[in-house]
Amino acid sequence: AISSKGWTTPTEIQFEAIPVARKGRDVVGQARTGSGKTAAFGIPIIEAASASGKPQAIILCPTRELAVQVAEELTWLQGESGLSIQTVYGGTDIDKQARELQSGSDIMVGTPGRVIDMSKRGHLNLSDISHFCLDEADRMLDMGFFPDVLWIFEQMPAREQTLLFSATFPQEVLDAAEEFMNAPVYVMSDDLEVEVPEIDQFAVRIGPSN
């Protein structure tokens, strides 16, 4: 799928992270937005999964928009693998999502709240999940999401690998990650500058009555 789309050279984060993840190691990957982080964790997850119809990997995202985006890219990356990649996120019909899950799923992409809801309702079994990934991990491990992430993690006794990817990793986030990572390999891209387009700035003076 990758070569057919014209991909010939991996980005730095892909070049550094994919071989390590393929070996089954836990990975903390840091690179700027737009550097190919999704493929960096998505390719090893796809390669490790089989079209069994049972959840083997789960990727958590902070927003439903990102969950949809990640799922679409994974679907593109898998090519003819035949994997079922499903999304679960809030703000949509939960019964419809439950029916979709019943048809079978190999890789799940979702938001923490809806994943927990689906699990507690019996629609999503996390016990056989072997690969666990946090996208935008800096947001996923802040104080707002951390309890939910930890709850989900505790439902995965079969977990073999944890992948964390983000553009930034404050020290408190790295400390939180120690709760559920096993001797992770840190992959930090050298190209972390934020690309900011040129912006025309101007000022408008208004009278005191306004």
Regions found by a protein language model. Name each.
Residues 1-30:
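Conserved pre-motif I regulatory segment
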Residues 4-7, 53-120, 128-131, 174-178, ...:
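Conserved nucleic-acid-binding Ia/Ib motif block in the N-terminal RecA-like helicase ATPase lobe
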Residues 28-30, 58, 163:
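Short hydrophobic/aromatic beta-strand immediately N-terminal to the Walker A/P-loop
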Residues 34, 113-115, 138-139:
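Short glycine-rich anion-binding loops that position phosphate/pyrophosphate groups of nucleotides
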